Amino acid sequence: MDEQKGDRVMTKETVCLRIEHHAVLFALLARQAVELCGEKGKESILRGMTVYGKERGRRMACNARKRGDEINTMTNQAYGEWKPDFDGQMEFGQIHTQPTLQTYIAKCAWCDAWEKHGLTEYGRLYCVNVDNAVYQGYQDKYVCTQVTEPMSWGGPRCEFDWGCPLTPEENEALAAKKKELGASCMKDFTFHTAHLRATISRILIEDLGDDGQRAVDRALAEFAELFGQECLDVLDTVPEEEIYPKEAFV
């Protein structure tokens, strides 16, 4: 029998994390890093997000290569690793495909989570470079540029320019590829939250030493207090070799 406890979604067998958990853990790590180390903490969080994003992009590219697909802007749009928790949670799409592909996000579950928990000041650091970092991890020919101020920084919606056009034929191929792949390359947010914890923690400790470890410990304790110890413990069930598959990290 399913059981609901506050912000926790539980069954007797498992705990399933959502975008909210992912968003809040990042913001807690960012807050602790900034409060303990000021500008150095902020710089470390931003570096951590760039590393984290590039790691996601490398996994995506690995999936594309394993299926015989070229590494380009079209396939980058097809090989995403996540989907919303439920219909209507996010609102996003294309603005145009020529002269370059531009996309938008008009409703964001990360922004909603940060606002709910009073963490937007720190959560918005997630948005500074994550989309470009994922893109750069996938390929290194083009840059993803934020056309507008992100919603978390006060903008009306997030808009991105991917630096490369999609022809009508490529856009049709994109729709077909998404349909073909379905959810086969996607990971749940227990996985994504475990990846976030692993990479951001590693970078904070590398950059900030004992203060970085202290920031991580405090943030994880806050996370467990907020969502329950089981929501922290479930992160340990995600194998490191799944987060960092050898074929993507050679």
Please describe what each predicted stretch is.
Residues M1-T100, A109-W110, W114-Y126, A133, ...:
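N-terminal accessory segment detector
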